[in-house]
Design a protein with these regions (language model features):
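Short edge-strand/loop segments of extracellular domains
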Residues: 108-112
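Bacterial peptidoglycan biogenesis and beta-lactam-recognition machinery
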Residues: 99-101, 178-182
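Acidic, glycine-rich segments characteristic of secretory precursors and extracytoplasmic regions
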Residues: 1-19, 32-34, 46, 61, ...
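Conserved, well-structured interaction surfaces
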Residues: 24-99, 113-126, 132-159
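Aromatic-lined, polymer-binding surfaces characteristic
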Residues: 101, 158-167
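TPR/Sel1-like alpha-solenoid repeat signature
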Residues: 85, 168-174
Length: 182
């Protein structure tokens, strides 16, 4: 369910969810989605929330540890940091589009810190743009971009990595959503 949660939850913005079957109890979550009465405890939004905040936690933990890690190749460290900023921006972009006000967490939390206040979408979009601009602006030692420019420059083992082009495209999409043109 977690792999299709985004596609299902994003349908609340449209009118494409229909429960199918013989009774009113068939696909109850889908029926609630169609009637705009989705609960936060329903599988789809809960799975998305968990998936994205797990990714954000991992990015934040990564940022906390990366500078203390030993690297033989500093260009690799720069690439990983740029990819981390891209991923955190990606996770927050989906969260803010689907849920509006969400907690904006930029450091790893302990269980004592779990009760976080929700941030206004403007603050979340600002952080998304900051993360993407950071990813785009990170450089290797020779001054070239830290991220690989395009997906076709990867060998098969690295397909799916974040690229400079992906970061620029996501930034454009973020600005379109935030300014209301999309």
């Amino acid at each position: 369910a977690q792999n299709c949660a985004f596609e299902v939850v994003s349908e609340i913005l449209g009118d494409c969810c229909y429960a199918g079957g013989a009774s009113a109890n068939d696909a109850v979550q889908t029926s609630r989605l169609d009637r705009f009465t989705m609960l936060v405890s329903d599988l789809y939004p809960e799975a998305l929330w968990h998936k994205y905040y797990t990714g954000i936690y991992r990015c934040n933990k990564f940022f906390e540890k990366i500078d203390g890690a030993a690297f033989e190749d500093e260009d690799l460290r720069a690439m990983y940091k740029a990819e981390g900023h891209f991923l955190r921006a990606y996770y927050y972009f989906d969260l803010v589009r689907l849920f509006g006000n969400v907690p904006l967490i930029l450091t790893p939390l302990t269980p004592a810190d779990f009760a976080q206040k929700q941030a206004e979408p403007a603050a979340v979009y600002e952080q998304i743009a900051t993360d993407l601009l950071t990813a785009i602006g990170m450089k290797r030692a020779d001054g070239s971009p830290a991220m690989t420019e395009a997906a076709n420059q990867f060998d098969s083992a690295d397909k799916g990595r974040a690229t400079l082009d992906a970061a620029k495209a996501l930034l454009c999409r973020v600005w379109l959503y935030y300014t209301g043109y999309y």
